[in-house]
């Protein structure tokens, strides 16, 4: 569940080099084996391999002069603000996340289906699904 991921966030941060894509992209097979033994993270081999792969895809994009942030903000110039009244009204995916997931797959990303892509867009602030009475609904960073 997403809560499990959030509960282990600091362990993931340590295990994946502070989420530095340049460093993760250079992980060796020995480092990968260490991740599979790390009890502080979710030890799913396919997901660990996907994380390393995705870091490599990102660094390739950077070498080619592309930034994911620029690509996303070109597609989504202003955050999408939804107005759910309760948590059960928050979608897990939408047409945008389905289309982006297809594009991510074509680029070479793994484990970035429509639900994960939607959650990613929420996490980076491009989709605001805070319920209406949430104090963070309209805050900006």
Predicted regions located by residue number:
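HhH-family (HhH-GPD) DNA N-glycosylase catalytic core used in base-excision repair
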Residues: 1-141
């Amino acid at each position: 569940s997403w809560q499990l991921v959030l509960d282990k966030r600091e362990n993931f941060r340590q295990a994946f080099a502070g989420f530095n894509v340049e460093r993760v992209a250079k992980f060796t097979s020995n480092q990968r084996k260490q991740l599979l033994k790390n009890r502080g993270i979710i030890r799913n081999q396919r997901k660990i391999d996907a994380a390393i792969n995705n870091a490599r895809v990102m660094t390739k994009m950077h070498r080619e002069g592309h930034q994911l942030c620029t690509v996303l903000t070109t597609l989504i110039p202003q955050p999408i603000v939804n107005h759910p009244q309760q948590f059960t009204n928050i979608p897990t995916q939408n047409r945008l996340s389905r289309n982006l997931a297809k594009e991510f797959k074509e680029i070479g990303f793994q484990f970035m289906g429509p639900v994960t892509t939607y959650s990613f867009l929420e996490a980076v602030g491009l989709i605001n699904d805070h319920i209406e009475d949430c104090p963070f609904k309209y805050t900006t960073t």
